[in-house]
């Protein structure tokens, strides 16, 4: 996109998104760049932290001294399987629309072509892993059992072991890989492993893990622009299908080296704090992980292992500060499930809120209600997030590592250039016609 503005002599000035921002950065202030276009920018005096990536020795989140581990029975999906009337109707309405048993009324973007795409994308996850996606453990490719070599391979150093594991994980399909130390704070106290009985049992590992390998997978950008229509669901489903295959391969790799491995997707433990602990990204207003490279447009899986590994440090790159002033996801959320509060807090919204961490709490019940309306996992919040871009302007800030007052007004630029405003119908057409 190119902005066009006339100067005082009536001549047209053309400025691309990237050159516009680079001009602003070159002047040292976002306001200078905006002045080229004659705009006044709100919040320009609120200077954010450095835009570069900073490493930390401890978790960059405030955790309560009385933090209690989360029980999986409280996730909105497990509540539905357990018969919770508050969420069960919405859950089965969502499933019914997703499978086509309940007719869709969404119009373009919900046609047979898109249904076929969505079903195909989810096919490996659904046909091989069964009920894994809602959070059931030890199913399909995420099986906890596997032949372990009796001869443990000895790496010279934990650093070399981590290097080998990351190489294998990216070779097998992961886009990002980080390693966290085992921390039982993020592990569910109890789990439900049988979708038919929804029986709760203590979450016990068959060995003592020492580390967690966390992998992030990029979802397709073009199809995600169709959110909340079916191509967004296909983008997520394709990754769920690929994620199980990669997790299984990495677990097999570890077992053949003579070490134990438990591959997990949405089950067993909280993925987002593990992603933060492994240095993959920051916690956001949406409640999901934002990575420097792909923003929030990723899915996560993890593998618990007893292989000695060198761990990665948690990082920050300005997400928390930016989320305080942006609120674009909260404004766009049809069900208003995302907090509008400026500051994160320890308050909980529903029983599904994982407490004890200072954050913006998501209303999972309202979120599921939106899923029930559209018959997909929505994704509007990810679509509109200013960090959800291909290699474009927000990456310039990260790469340059410059101190600039522009970070608080990135949403202004994001809106100015029309990001996240493409309709589901138009995005669906664009996807098929490109």
Residues covered by each model-derived region:
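N-terminal export leaders
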Residues: 16-39
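Catalytic cores of enzyme domains
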Residues: 166-167, 172-387, 399-404
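N-terminal secretory signal peptides
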Residues: 1-15, 19
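C-terminal/domain-terminus segments
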Residues: 389-413
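Ser/Thr/Pro/Gly-rich low-complexity linker/stalk segments immediately outside membranes or between
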Residues: 43-52
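A short, surface-exposed helix-loop junction/capping segment
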Residues: 139-150, 230-231
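Extended, charge-enriched "interface" segments that sit outside catalytic cores
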Residues: 64-134
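Long, compositionally biased charged/polar accessory segments in the mid-to-C-terminal portions
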Residues: 399, 411-434
């Amino acid at each position: 996109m190119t902005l066009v503005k006339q100067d005082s002599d009536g001549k047209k000035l053309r400025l691309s998104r990237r050159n516009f921002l680079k001009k602003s950065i070159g002047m040292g202030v976002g306001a200078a760049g905006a002045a080229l276009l004659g705009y006044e920018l709100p919040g320009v005096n609120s200077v954010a932290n450095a835009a570069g990536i900073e490493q930390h020795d401890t978790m960059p989140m405030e955790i309560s001294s009385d933090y209690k581990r989360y029980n999986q029975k409280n996730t909105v999906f497990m509540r539905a399987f357990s018969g919770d009337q508050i969420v069960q109707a919405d859950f089965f309405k969502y499933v019914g629309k997703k499978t086509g048993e309940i007719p869709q009324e969404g119009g373009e973007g919900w046609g047979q072509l898109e249904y076929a795409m969505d079903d195909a994308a989810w096919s490996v996850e659904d046909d091989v892993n069964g009920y894994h996606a809602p959070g059931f453990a030890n199913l399909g490719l995420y099986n906890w059992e596997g032949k372990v070599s009796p001869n443990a391979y000895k790496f010279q150093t934990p650093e070399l072991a981590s290097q080998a594991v990351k190489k294998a994980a990216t070779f097998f399909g992961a886009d990002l890989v980080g390693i966290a130390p085992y921390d039982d704070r993020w592990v569910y106290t109890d789990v439900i492993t049988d979708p038919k009985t929804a029986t709760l049992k203590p979450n016990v590992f068959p060995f003592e893990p020492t580390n967690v390998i966390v992998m992030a997978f990029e979802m397709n950008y073009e199809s995600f622009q169709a959110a909340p229509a079916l191509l967004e669901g296909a983008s997520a489903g394709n990754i769920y299908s690929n994620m199980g295959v990669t997790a299984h391969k990495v677990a097999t790799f570890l077992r053949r080296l003579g070490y134990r491995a438990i591959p997990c997707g949405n089950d067993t433990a909280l993925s987002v704090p593990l992603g933060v602990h492994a240095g993959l990204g920051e916690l956001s207003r949406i409640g999901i992980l934002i990575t420097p490279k792909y923003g929030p447009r990723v899915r996560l899986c993890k593998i618990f292992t007893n292989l000695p590994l060198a761990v990665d440090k948690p990082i920050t790159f300005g997400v928390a500060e930016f989320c305080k002033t942006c609120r674009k996801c909260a404004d766009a959320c049809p069900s208003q499930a995302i907090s509008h509060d400026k500051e994160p807090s320890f308050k909980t919204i529903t029983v599904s809120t994982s407490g004890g961490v200072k954050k913006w709490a998501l209303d999972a019940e309202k979120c599921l209600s939106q899923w029930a309306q559209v018959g997909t996992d929505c994704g509007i919040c990810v679509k509109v997030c200013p960090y959800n871009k291909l290699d474009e302007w927000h990456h310039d800030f990260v790469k340059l590592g410059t101190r600039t007052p522009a970070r608080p007004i990135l949403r202004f630029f994001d809106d100015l250039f029309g990001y996240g405003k493409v309709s589901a119908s138009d995005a669906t057409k664009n996807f098929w016609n490109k």
